[in-house]
C-alpha cells in the first residue's frame, strides 16, 4: 500500500530500481530509455516510473538530494514495496588526479562526513560498501560496452558548499575518486534491510582542477552511465 512518501501499490515497482537524485531526470530516463512506461508515484513531485528495458521490467525513481532524503525513499522501496536492488545513477565531482571528466565512477565503497550511519550503528563506523555481485556485473557490462570506468571509494558529503577545501587533498591521498551526497546512506539502508545496492556516477566536474563539462558532453556521459546501469539491471 501507499506510504507517506510513495503513493504506489505493492507490485508497481520492479525488483530493480534505478535512482537519480533529480525526479525530472527520472522522468527523462523513463521517456528515453524505457518502453511501456507507467508513472507509479508522484508525491512531492518525486516521480517514479516502471517500464521495460529489452523486455525486462525496470523501475526508475528520484531520491532527492542528500542522505536524509534518499534514505527515506530507499527504505520505503525495500521495506514496503519489495524492491531487491537499488542502483543509484548520478553525478560526482572528481578529486583524484587519475579521474577525468566524463569518466564513469563505480562506488565500491563510500566514506562520509554524515553522522546518519553512526546514529543507526550505536555510534560506530559502518563500512558502507556496494554489493559485490552488482559491482562485478556493472564492471563487466562497462567493459563489454567499451565505457571507461574507475572503481573505488567515493565520499558522500553532507555539505554541497563545504568550507573544508583542504579535505579534497586528503581524499585524493586516501584514493577517494569523487564526491557525491548519497552513496554511503544508500549502502547502509540496503545492508540494514537485506537488499543490494550500487552507485554508478558520471564525472561532471573536477573539483581540484576547476574543470566542468559542457551541457553536450554532460548528456553523452550520462547516456554512457545509464546504458551501463540498465545493462546491469537486466542481468540481475
From Swiss-Prot:
Enzyme Commission numbers on file: 2.4.2.1
A GO CC term assigned to this protein in UniProt: cytosol
Lineage top rank: taxon: Bacteria
Residues the record lists as binding a purine D-ribonucleoside: 5, 180-182, 204-205
Site (Important for catalytic activity) residue list: 218
Catalytic activity: a purine D-ribonucleoside + phosphate = a purine nucleobase + alpha-D-ribose 1-phosphate; a purine 2'-deoxy-D-ribonucleoside + phosphate = a purine nucleobase + 2-deoxy-alpha-D-ribose 1-phosphate
Example of a GO MF term: purine-nucleoside phosphorylase activity
Entry annotation: catalytic residues: 205 (proton donor)
Residues annotated for phosphate binding in this entry: 21, 25, 44, 88-91
Gene Ontology BP, a term: purine nucleoside catabolic process
Repeat in keyword set: no
Keywords: Glycosyltransferase, Transferase
UniProt family annotation: Belongs to the PNP/UDP phosphorylase family.
HAMAP family linked to this entry: Pur_nucleosid_phosp (MF_01627)
Role: Catalyzes the reversible phosphorolytic breakdown of the N-glycosidic bond in the beta-(deoxy)ribonucleoside molecules, with the formation of the corresponding free purine bases and pentose-1-phosphate.
Record's subunit section: Homohexamer; trimer of homodimers.
Protein name: Purine nucleoside phosphorylase DeoD-type
Organism from which the protein derives: Aliivibrio salmonicida (strain LFI1238) (Vibrio salmonicida (strain LFI1238))
Gene: deoD
Amino acid at each position: 500500500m501507499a506510504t507517506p512518501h510513495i503513493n504506489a501499490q505493492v507490485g508497481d515497482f520492479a525488483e530493480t530500481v534505478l535512482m537519480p537524485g533529480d525526479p525530472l531526470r527520472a522522468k527523462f530516463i523513463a521517456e528515453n530509455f524505457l518502453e511501456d512506461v507507467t508513472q507509479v508515484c508522484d508525491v512531492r513531485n518525486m516521480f517514479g516510473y516502471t517500464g521495460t528495458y529489452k523486455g525486462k521490467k525496470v523501475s526508475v525513481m528520484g531520491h532527492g538530494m542528500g542522505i536524509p532524503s534518499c534514505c527515506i525513499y530507499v527504505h520505503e522501496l525495500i521495506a514496503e514495496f519489495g524492491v531487491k536492488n537499488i542502483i543509484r545513477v548520478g553525478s560526482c565531482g572528481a578529486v583524484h588526479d587519475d579521474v577525468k571528466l566524463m569518466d564513469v565512477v563505480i562506488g565500491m565503497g563510500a566514506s562520509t562526513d554524515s553522522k546518519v550511519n553512526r546514529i543507526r550503528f550505536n555510534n560506530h563506523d559502518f563500512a558502507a560498501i556496494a554489493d559485490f555481485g552488482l559491482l562485478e556485473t556493472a564492471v563487466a557490462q562497462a567493459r563489454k560496452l567499451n565505457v571507461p570506468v574507475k572503481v573505488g571509494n567515493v565520499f558522500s558529503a553532507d555539505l554541497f558548499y563545504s568550507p573544508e577545501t583542504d579535505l579534497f587533498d586528503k581524499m585524493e591521498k586516501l584514493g577517494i575518486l569523487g564526491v557525491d551526497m548519497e552513496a554511503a546512506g544508500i549502502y547502509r539502508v540496503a545492508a540494514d534491510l537485506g537488499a543490494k545496492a550500487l552507485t554508478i556516477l558520471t564525472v561532471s566536474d573536477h573539483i581540484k582542477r576547476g574543470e566542468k563539462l559542457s551541457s553536450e558532453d554532460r548528456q553523452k556521459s550520462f547516456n554512457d552511465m545509464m546504458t551501463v546501469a540498465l545493462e546491469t539491471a537486466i542481468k540481475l
